[in-house]
Regions:
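N-terminal export/assembly segments and adjacent metallocofactor-ligating motifs
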Residues: 1-136
Length: 136
């Protein structure tokens, strides 16, 4: 276990401590605090655990779906840096686009503002970009 998601959810970024280590020794595994369902945990769905996962155990849903369909192709993706429009913090966003559609948003680890971390709006708010359908 590398614990990067636990650290991102804890003291490193979010301070919600929704992800923890459950079990001991050979039974140790990454889980939610008190081993409850994610919806019942302290998770704020910021996605910082996804952003730091080096193994691919945690990935963006868009990436998972595109990989399953065989359409995910990083060699065809462009990256564009911009600033998050949702608040005044000024987080640096890196938009990953494939076939002129945003497929995921990350933040550079060397960013002095975010150090690679984002809130839920910065990381997942892109789903509203370019979508003209009315939302409820």
């Amino acid at each position: 276990l590398c614990y990067k998601c636990v650290e991102a959810c804890g003291t490193d970024a979010q301070n919600t401590f929704a992800i923890a280590v459950a079990g001991r020794g050979f039974d140790a595994r990454i889980s939610t605090e008190f081993d409850v369902a994610l919806d019942d945990s302290a998770c704020v769905f910021c996605g910082n655990c996804i952003g730091v996962c080096p193994t691919g155990a945690l990935v963006f849903k868009s990436e998972f779906d595109m990989r399953a369909a065989g359409t995910w192709d990083e060699s065809k993706q462009t990256r564009t840096e911009t600033v998050c429009p949702y608040c005044g913090v000024g987080c640096v966003l890196e938009l990953h686009a494939q076939e002129e559609r945003i497929v995921k948003v990350t933040s550079p680890a060397d960013s002095t503002v975010t150090e690679g971390h984002l809130c839920i709006k910065g990381r997942f708010g892109w789903i509203y970009a370019g979508d003209s359908r009315p939302r409820e």
